[in-house]
UniProtKB/Swiss-Prot annotation:
Catalyzed chemical reaction(s): O-phospho-L-seryl-[protein] + H2O = L-seryl-[protein] + phosphate; O-phospho-L-threonyl-[protein] + H2O = L-threonyl-[protein] + phosphate
Region Disordered, annotated ranges: 1-48, 401-431
PANTHER family found in the cross-reference section: PROTEIN PHOSPHATASE (PTHR47992)
Primary location group: membrane
Quaternary state and interactors: Interacts with KIN10.
UniProt protein name: Probable protein phosphatase 2C 74
Annotated source species: Arabidopsis thaliana
PROSITE patterns: PPM_2
Length: 448
């Protein structure tokens, strides 16, 4: 999303799937060319990424299918640092889909976001396979669904591993749920470790948010770090479509997050020109100020309270649940949860829902934050039923993606316990949105 005025160092690389190293002729050994940190010319980008893009059911460009609509648009701050993905038939499991949006920040945030987009689903799939085979899962479910239940409609797993529970109800298939939850937590942990080891992506002062979701039948498991958000469109008792926020915006001033940050000697305060935006700062340096408490990358802050452990929540879907919207803060800063649900519901076709959200957010940015540049936007709308009356032909064309003029030419390259009132995050009202990651000015905050 934003930019970082300080940058340094880099971190490790993923092994190439194909190709062999160049062998120079006899005589003087040829020195390998230097690679700028954060360069897109990494071995992963050149070999593994094209293979990923040919996987059936994996989508990362503007487009739609019968049940999903994706759309991203570059803002006015530089490269589009937002990324998104939908992977149908994920993990070779029937009626299973993986969705995610990622909001990069810092000088190489666009690269970090796309790297996480590409690798995190692979790590999650690997952990799912290591738990148990699909056949064993079905056998286990058939043996245990009658007597093994989880209390509550929504189960929330906090950073310390303790569970918090909301909306009392009974949920079957405990083994399947625990498998999904455990796999998401492990995948996030290994993803951050891999970023730290990579030499071709500078993640010291660059990183990304992530909100990901696995839908397996009627089971919905969401993992979240940062301030991207997932919102459910659900019918209330009056049959009115209302928003239900599935994730919590993990800002530094959230009490549980602030307690951890202060315990790790990180500082939390807002700048004078954006008093409602709390930031995480190093204890003795005037940079960087990160407007979130959890993120992939940003290793300069990892010893001072920033973590990559996801908040994981579970929900058992019902017939009243109509769609889920995953989006970066370019959407949520400009639109309330209620507005987002209304726009999706009123879209002429499901395939146009993602574009409609982005266009509405851009319009709102121009009057809500007139002194700020429009932010990047990325949105995934997943519809939870299969009604065909609002569907249109799926569209995934490289030409459309590029000719729109709204996104980069990429192919070659918790939870609230009650429905949201639609008022949005109060700390954003009247604030000029600047950057996710900034340097501290010459002044420092006064002591309380």
């Amino acid at each position: 999303m934003g930019s970082c005025l300080s940058s340094s160092g880099g971190g490790g690389s993923r092994r190439s799937l194909h190709g062999s190293p160049h062998v120079p002729g006899p005589g003087r050994r040829k020195r390998p060319p230097k690679r700028r940190p954060g360069s897109c010319s990494s071995s992963f980008d050149n070999t593994e990424e094209p293979l990923l893009h040919r996987i059936p059911g994996r989508m990362f460009l503007n487009g739609s299918t019968d049940t999903v609509s994706l759309f991203s648009q570059q803002g006015k701050k530089g490269p589009n640092q937002d990324a998104m993905i939908v992977w149908e038939n994920f993990g070779s499991m029937e009626d299973t889909v993986f969705c995610g949006v990622f909001d990069g920040h810092g000088p190489y945030g666009h690269i970090v976001a796309k790297r996480v987009r590409d690798l995190l689903p692979l790590k999650l799939g690997s952990h799912l396979e290591s738990y148990v085979s699909p056949e064993e899962v079905l056998k286990e479910i058939s043996l245990n669904t009658d007597d093994r239940k989880i209390s509550e409609d929504l189960v929330h797993i906090s950073a310390n591993g303790e569970s918090r529970v909301y909306n009392k109800d009974y949920v079957k298939d405990q083994d399947m749920i625990q498998m999904l939850i455990g796999s998401i937590v492990k995948a996030y942990r290994f993803m951050d470790k891999e970023l730290k080891m990579q030499v071709d992506v500078d993640c010291f002062c660059s990183g990304t948010t992530a909100v990901t979701m696995v839908k397996q039948g009627q089971h919905l498991v969401i993992g979240n770090i940062g301030d991207s958000r997932a919102v459910l469109g659900v019918r209330n008792k009056d049959n009115k479509l209302v928003p239900f926020q599935l994730t919590e915006d993990l800002k530094p001033d959230v009490p549980a997050e602030a307690e951890r940050i202060k315990r790790c000697r990180g500082r939390i305060f807002a700048l004078r020109d954006e008093p409602g935006v709390a930031r995480l700062w190093l204890p003795n340096h005037n940079s960087p100020g990160l407007a979130m408490a959890r993120a992939f990358g940003d290793f300069c802050l990892k010893d001072f309270g920033l973590i990559s452990v996801p908040d994981v929540s579970y929900r058992r879907l019902t017939e009243k649940d109509e769609f889920v919207v995953l989006a970066t803060d370019g959407i949520w800063d400009a639109l309330t949860n209620e507005e987002v649900v209304k726009i999706v519901a009123k879209a002429p076709t499901r395939s146009s829902a993602g574009r409609a959200l982005v266009e509405a957010a851009v319009r709102n940015w121009r009057w809500k934050f007139p002194t700020s540049k429009v932010d990047d936007c990325a949105v995934v709308c997943l519809f939870l039923d299969s009604e065909p009356n609002r569907l249109s032909t799926a569209s995934f064309s490289k030409e459309k993606h590029i000719n729109n003029g709204v996104t980069e030419p990429e192919p070659d390259t918790a939870s609230s316990s009650t429905p949201d009132s639609g008022t949005g995050s109060p700390e954003l009202n009247g604030v000029n949105r600047i950057d996710t990651l900034v340097n501290l000015p010459v002044y420092v905050p006064t002591k309380e």
